[in-house]
Design a protein with these regions (language model features):
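Aromatic-rich, lipid-facing transmembrane alpha helices and their immediate juxtamembrane interface loops
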Residues: 1-142
Length: 142
């Protein structure tokens, strides 16, 4: 996750042309350090939720990646408003390629978490996921 962010923000090749604001704090190579934590925590809670669904492992992985994408779709329009990050202004927001490559980066992370059964507490995972959904949903209406 963090490696993809470092490459992406410095080249514009992975997620599109974007930059981070100051809201997320200390940066290493133009990427807030907290982004590494965000990738791990989001992967862990989405993988935990998906792994509780009694379907085959590939379907659990697909669900986990989808849960991550739902959050990303919700966060992207709000991120520039609160100076988290912003895409090139000429693009009018996050390009479709951002979501595609986001899923491609999330895929090996979710595969690793789910195949190795690295789940977290399901109640905490559900609460963290729901609180993020609620937080960014409310912000989208302000």
């Amino acid at each position: 996750g963090i490696l993809a962010e470092i490459i992406g923000v410095n080249t514009g090749l992975i997620f599109g042309s974007y930059e981070y604001g100051q809201t997320l704090g200390f940066q290493i190579m133009n990427v807030p350090l907290v982004m590494g934590i965000i990738w791990v925590v989001t992967s862990l809670i989405c993988g935990t939720i998906a792994s509780q669904i009694k379907v085959r492992t590939p379907i659990q992985i697909f669900i986990a990646v989808s849960l991550m994408l739902i959050l990303d779709v919700l966060i992207e329009p709000i991120a520039p408003k609160i100076d988290m990050w912003s895409f090139d202004h000429s693009s009018g927001g996050a390009p479709l390629s951002n979501y595609i490559t986001w899923a491609l980066v999330a895929l090996p992370l979710q595969t690793y978490f789910i195949v190795n059964r690295l789940g977290f507490n399901i109640i905490i995972s559900l609460n963290l996921y729901a609180s993020q959904l609620l937080f960014f949903a409310v912000l989208s209406f302000l």
